[in-house]
Amino acid sequence: MNFLSKQEQMIKKSINELGYNVDEVLLIPSSRKEFGDYQYNGVMSIAKQMHKNPREIALDIIEKLKDNKDLVNVNVQGPGFINLSFSEEALVNYLNEVKDNININYEYDNKKTIFLDYGGANVAKTLHVGHLRSANIGEALKRLAEALGNKTISDVHLGDWGRPLGLVILEFSKRQPDLCYFDDNYTGVYPDKSTVTNEDLMEIYPTASIKAKEDENYLEEARIVTKKLQEGHKGYNELWKQIIKVSSEDIKKTYTKLNTTFDLWEGESDCYKSIPEMLEYINTLNITKKSEGAVVIDVKKEDDEIEYPPFMLIKSNGGASYQTTDLAAIFQRVKKYNPDEIWYVADNRQALHFETVFRAAKLTKIAPDVELVFAGFGTMNGSDGKPFKTRDGGVMSLNNLIDLVKVESEKKLLPNIIEDRDEVAQCVAISAIKYADLIPFRTTDYVFDLVKFSDLNGKTGPYLLYSTIRMKSLLANAKKENIKYNNVEMIDDNTKEIVLNLLNINKVLIKSFNTKSLNEITDLLYKITNSYNNFYSQVRILTEKNEKIRSSWLAITDIVYQNNVKLLDILGINVPERM
């Protein structure tokens, strides 16, 4: 159990021994440091239940807490707010435990198996800035879950089976009608070598999409091609496989730049295979009805504050809907992986869609015991407050965004970084992009400021990297000069704030896990780093004459460095050797 949790349990035990039965004690950082480092505000609730004066109860409690040697300066303020600080001995013991085992800060009892669906890449299309937040938030949530000891399974869930693929195949058939894929009578072996390049796809899909909007006949042809593809047309399926392979390789390269990985590279096509079995099961439940030629499930509830449309199981043309594909994904995932929870990381605007799917999953008992979570996010906007665009108003590709930030980041690197300058600039750029993307609460929109987010000063990824690298360099220099350090032996005014920030790691991680938002981790990481830098600027660690003080300072530096690296890793940010 981590330090704060232990203290809360001990205080709870003391309070209950006085006859005040409380279920939990929560210590929060005090807003008035002159009274103490932490505050307990639960006395008012106890007083209400016991019909007693809250200040009298608070005085009873602090008298009892005098027996706890880990606490100092226990006092009551106002009507019954208990303030306290931890003894230097208790904090020193905590630091030495963490130094020997950093995982103390990353404990979590209620471990689960969690399936995460994020990324949302579409085959035959380039990844653009609209895909950034799903990748960053999803990857960080996965790493957070793993850091707390949960088992995770992640899936990119490619958009690889709908009309966009029909459009691409149709346009190929218009341009190269003699290819064997379009000959219904072809009986030979299809080519091993792909006839499709990613450059082809980047041009073909936009062209086909425009044609479909302008020409109803072209759109109808695309519908027919899509239907034939989904019904198993051999030639179309062979070409489709090539499109998937080529496009997926390009998508993987971009995700790799973002330090984003997936256990599964499955897509809508994989879920499509489960639809017949799922429909057969649903048909036994007698919960569907016909509506204008379609088969639907009513998912409305009496206490709904908004109008929920019915879940469309089968469209009026006999095809499976997009909702059905997502329900089939849940059906397949529950059956194959038996997760405790499934998290979907997608744009806020998909909230109604997913809530409808989740309700259908519960009504059909496809996922009766699985918690289905929609982790919606806001948009990344430009300086005009509208979704981020290129200068000419187009949608910016993710690669272009990364390159822009990389150019800005490269300007900040030391001139003596020559050999791996490009690699380091890339690492710094990704830190700028990811940290900025994770600072706001998940559901909040934010404005992307290229210059601000690339700055080496302030609340930025590059600032955190630079500071963490400096810690590592300090420890390396101590080793070079044969300056040894072991345990923390003392905490002074210079290091107290650092320690108090470190104490909050476990609580912040668990809260972030529960809210599915990384903003409090980004905030705590900045506080830890900033408090360390304030300390660093006030002392001369390696030239300190007092060995006890110097050893403690170096040990604390080591602890902060270890936690910074781990917290940055949770956010999906790598620390380069230098910058």
Model-derived features: positions:
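Non-catalytic interaction-recognition regions
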Residues: M1-V92, Y108-M579
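Secondary-structure boundary elements
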Residues: A90-N105
